């Protein structure tokens, strides 16, 4: 039971890390969902 819990926690951690990498990766503004722009390879909200 303990092994299963550790495995599930590890799987969740890996999924979160993969999700963060996918969100941050952009080369141009069109790679980000509106209203966000690509700033230094990261999708950032555009204000103003």
From Swiss-Prot:
GO terms for cellular component: extracellular region. This is Peptide HSTX-III. The keyword Cell inner membrane does not apply. It comes from the Eukaryota. Leech salivary gland peptide with unknown function. Does not show effect on voltage-gated calcium channels, potassium channels, and tetrodotoxin-sensitive sodium channels. Does not show activity on Nav1.7/SCN9A, and shows very weak activity on cation channel TRPA1. Keywords: Amidation, Disulfide bond, Secreted, Signal. Disulfide bonds join 26-38, 32-43. Belongs to the annelide toxin family.
